Structures are given as C-alpha cells and as structure tokens.
Amino acid sequence: MKVNIAEKFSKISEYWKPYIAAELNGQQVKLDKLKGEFVFHHHEHEDELFLVVKGRFRMEFRDHNEWIEEGEFIVVPRGVEHKPVADEECWILLFEPASTLNTGNVVNDRTIKELERV
C-alpha cells in the first residue's frame, strides 16, 4: 500500500484530530495537525512515536522540554507524562498501537475514541 503523505494532509483541516492513514501488525500510522497546546497525559500500556513531517513542535515533560524539528522524531515511553505544544501549525505522523487513546489517561473534549480514516 502506497500513501502520499502530502495528499493525505491536504484532507485534514482540524487540529488535534488524528486520522488513521494505515495499519500494520496491530499498530496504526496516524496523521495529525497540531497548533496550540494539548493536555498533559500518559499512556499506561503504549509507547508513542511522533515524526515531524512539516514544521516543529515542543514536547513538554514534567522535568524538561524537547523541540522536535522537521524530519526528526521522538519516542515517548509508556507511563511518561507529556504534552505536545505547537506555536505554529505542525504536521505529525504518529506510530503507535491501535489501542492508543489520543488523550491517554485523561478524558476531555479532545478525546477521540473512534478515529476516522484519511
């Protein structure tokens, strides 16, 4: 299965609403546009990989922050509290288990239980 990432991102208009682009071996490749702040949360059983396709964002942890630039990725281990923050629009590709809830242990107005495909 071949996927044109730029074409997929052109169909995404909302921030903080991940879409499924592909699935493999119980994992999902998700695409999301970020802008502004998310919420501190953690995932009890899942690690998350965030790859910056366009732009950059800051991953805030309780004890430090990391800037992730275009072409870079960061892996957030399960159980680690984190909060993505994007001052400008940022396109990210997420690779994580299909069971991963976008807000982890927090349920709020940004929680999306059923993801759409793009």
Range-by-range predicted roles:
Residues 20, 37-40:
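Short, charged beta-strand/loop "edge" motif centered at a coil->beta-strand transition
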Residues 26-28, 35-37, 54-58, 65, ...:
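Short, charged/polar surface micro-motifs in flexible loops or helix N-caps
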Residues 1-30, 107-118:
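A short, N-terminal "cap"/entry segment at the start of jelly-roll beta-barrel domains
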